[in-house]
Amino acid sequence: MSLDMQEWREETTAIVNELLADGSNPDLEYEIEHHFACQDFDLLEKAAVDLFKAGFEVTDAEEMELDDGATIFCFDATTECKLDIETIVADIAKMLPILEKYGVDYDGWGTYFQE
């Protein structure tokens, strides 16, 4: 898990610029899905509760098996906003201390193309 905000800023800038270059509509609100994973369900659940308290919508946790047979638990926290780099980076900055507190990995964010 990288907690370097400069890396997340660069990745966010690249994603937003690619979506806009592909013709995604800059005037619409987008559902931004932030992805999280942890091998310890209890810690993941605590992080989800704290993210909810911080104002994010959270999805139910899912169990996944990795290629090596290990089990991890995952969930998303969602927000709605325009494709605004500063807004998305501010949300990441708000989330990272919560994730660090519980040892939960931040696996980046995504959204869908909109015309």
UniProtKB/Swiss-Prot annotation:
Annotated SUPFAM superfamilies: Hypothetical protein VC0424
Keyword Ubl conjugation: no
GO MF, any single term: endoribonuclease inhibitor activity
InterPro entries: RraB, RraB-like_sf, RraB_dom
Assigned keywords, A-Z: Cytoplasm
GO cellular component terms listed in the entry, alphabetical order: cytoplasm
Entry's localization field: Cytoplasm
Role summary: Globally modulates RNA abundance by binding to RNase E (Rne) and regulating its endonucleolytic activity. Can modulate Rne action in a substrate-dependent manner by altering the composition of the degradosome.
Similarity remark: Belongs to the RraB family.
Subunit structure as annotated in this protein's UniProt entry: Interacts with the C-terminal region of Rne.
HAMAP family per record: RraB
Name of the protein in its database record: Regulator of ribonuclease activity B
